[in-house]
């Protein structure tokens, strides 16, 4: 049995890509996209006709609408291949605007529904700022399921659980990147690998908290740098994995055991936690890593959204 097949026994495997032509070989249940992945895909010759067709069909419409329609076109193509859900992201430039995020999330769902896609097959991705979490709360109350992304801290996870969002995406690799860069020459790779990886430890803490307190929000580890990070989180509700790392898992037959377990988490002695807006902002501010990576992630996704718009204008 390959490691990929073994992982699927414990965890829902999700493909993290906009390149839907790669999906079939790995047979993922779900798929995730973001502006950076879509930008990467549309620059490939295979996807140029899809972008030109979208621009041609909706010429004269507002640029933000054309971009949303392109994201939905990719999402529909992905959903024709996978049995589960696709995550489509709201423009990161709205990360601090609750009302605008709700409006864009509703429009994305309307565009999917116009293509015959059931609402339960789409997760609206929103950055896990306070404003984003409040937008997700509103969307969930309207029956629209959400995926809270750019999640780097325990306080973000707790607030998402309080908002009863469908799913969160804690970023393993970017947490690892920050701690490795911060340590500089003092970084010990072996001592910070696998279960001791700072990104893995963050997801494990969140998973244990959710399972211990019966929080229904799904935990989907994301942003992996190596196979060790993935295998150390076997048993997590979902893991979203790049095609490159999926290929490595599919090529390996090394043993893989469950690392996270809901029953074990339920038996832990953990303190209850909750955050109001003031407490959330203070806790996030106290976490230098999370503050820096959240801001950096929003800037990067926003910049790629601008690049995507420029490609649409030039198409």
UniProtKB/Swiss-Prot annotation:
The keyword rRNA-binding does not apply. Pathway: Carbohydrate degradation; pentose phosphate pathway; D-glyceraldehyde 3-phosphate and beta-D-fructose 6-phosphate from D-ribose 5-phosphate and D-xylulose 5-phosphate (non-oxidative stage): step 2/3. Gene3D superfamilies: Aldolase class I. Signal peptide: none annotated. The active site is at residue 125. Keywords: Cytoplasm, Pentose shunt, Schiff base, Transferase. One of its GO terms (cellular component) is cytoplasm. One of its GO terms (molecular function) is transaldolase activity. It comes from the Bacteria. Pfam families: TAL_FSA. InterPro entries: Aldolase_TIM, TAL/FSA, Transaldolase_1, Transaldolase_AS. It is found in: Cytoplasm. CDD domains: Transaldolase_TalAB. Its EC number is 2.2.1.2. It catalyses: D-sedoheptulose 7-phosphate + D-glyceraldehyde 3-phosphate = D-erythrose 4-phosphate + beta-D-fructose 6-phosphate. One of its GO terms (biological process) is pentose-phosphate shunt, non-oxidative branch. Its main location: cytoplasm. Belongs to the transaldolase family. Type 1 subfamily. Homodimer. Transaldolase is important for the balance of metabolites in the pentose-phosphate pathway. This is Transaldolase.
